[in-house]
Structure formats: C-alpha cells, structure tokens
Amino acid sequence: LSLLPLLITAAFDVGETPHVKLRDTRQRVLHHMEGLLAWLESSVFRQIVFAKNCGIKIQERLLCETAAAFGKEVEFLEIPCSKLTARQGKGFGEGEIVGGALERSGLLGKAPYFAKSTGKLFLKNHELLLADKWRARCFRCAAPNRGNSSSWYRLVNKLHQSEVGSRCLADMHRLLRVPWFFICARPQCWVDTRFYVCERDFYLSNLSRSHRRVQDRLGYSLEASFYDDLQRVEGVGWIDEMPLVYGTSGTLGTTAAPFVDALRHRAQALAEELLSP
C-alpha cells in the first residue's frame, strides 16, 4: 500500500461556495503549497496527483519540478467546476474533483488503491491509513446527538440519504422557506473525508455518488454522506484515533498545527512563482 498514489484535492478560488471562511485566492494558493511541500518532504508517497477545480491559472511545470527535486512525481489535473457546488456546498465540489481525477488521471488509472488528502493539509500520522489492507480505511468521529431519537428526524435523515430526498429538502428550504430546524440533518457519526485510503473499484461502486446528496446549508455534509454509505458495506477499516493534522482549514479559516517556518517560506516563494505571469 505504500506504493499507492496520493490524490490532493484543491480549490484556489471558491467562488460562491457557502460555509468557507478562507476565501482569499492568494492565501489559498499559499496554504495549498504548504500542504503539498509537507507531503513531498515527509511522506512515503512517491506519486502525487494534484487536482484543482477552478479557473485560476498557474505554472504547473513548477509543481513537477518541485516534486522532482524530492525524487517524486506530480501529475497536475484541471477538473471542471460544477455550478451545483455553490448551491450544495464544498463537499459536492470535493466529490466532483475526486470523480474527475479517477476518470482522467494516468497515475490513478494504473493503481488499484489510492490515498486522498484535502489540499492545504498534511496528516502526520498518515501511516495509520496504510497499517492494514482494507477496501477502505477511514478516520471516524462521533457527531453531537441532536435529536436522532425523534421519529420526525429519523424520517428527515432517511430523506437526506437519498438523492431525490435531499433535493426535495433543499427545495423546501430554498423555495418554500421551510424553517431550517425542521429539515436539517442530525448525523450521529462522520467520516473524516480530509484523509482516507480506498480501493479504486470500491470507491466507484460505493462512494462515487455520495457527494450528490450533500446539502451543506441543511447540515448534511460529505462526512455524513460517506458514513451513511459506508455503513451499508463490508471491508471498511475504521480508525478511531485522532488524526494529527497540520495546515489551514479552508472551512474554518483556522490552523490546526502550523508548519515550520522554513517550509512556510518555501511555500510562499513557490506560491508567488506559480501565480506569476
């Protein structure tokens, strides 16, 4: 499993995507380069697929040259951005990037397994993802119990678990102005979708449509959707330890653990060069 490629998903320009605090494009590029350099310097992954879904132009050859300096390979992909991301949320866009990368990438196409990391972040204890051979290996965390025992909210959660149901709930909120607290999701568990390892065929069979049910405005995230789908299948290796995360969250705009100054300075220089004409 240590030979599998790492897919990094990136969005430099989030447009009108809701619930994203870090919106400045130059800052996003900087933090993405911090995460990329950390993976190049400190991980076992020798092949990295860097996939982004926005129109910001960069000098992609610099990514390949930077990886080569570490004896590693980077494949750069540009995935078309769906307009539904602005309506359904960042988890929808994330799913579109992963699906597009699996369809277009030469490195991912050759590999039976792949690892995935959200851009801007680095997982220090990523060896936990490679510890055993499962069809999927994920971090699991409990969500606050927000009334799941109610028959009404059990029905609402069932609706969130289908594509048709999730669209109906979103339309009820957006068009009919049904109050949020009547139709919001109340998940009991989440999958930490920032980092996971998955068998390619397993992902395509079980998780490739999970993002289509995401409704961030109603509290039904990609994390909840993944958990609901993985509950129905076998072959999942759950990790209940805390992930040791470095980098800046685009959602919260906060830094979990900062990178060392030397890496941050190199990332700053790389980001400026990437964006230069």
Which residue stretches match the model-derived regions?
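ER/Golgi luminal nucleotide-sugar-dependent glycosyltransferases, focusing on the catalytic module
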Residues: L1-P277
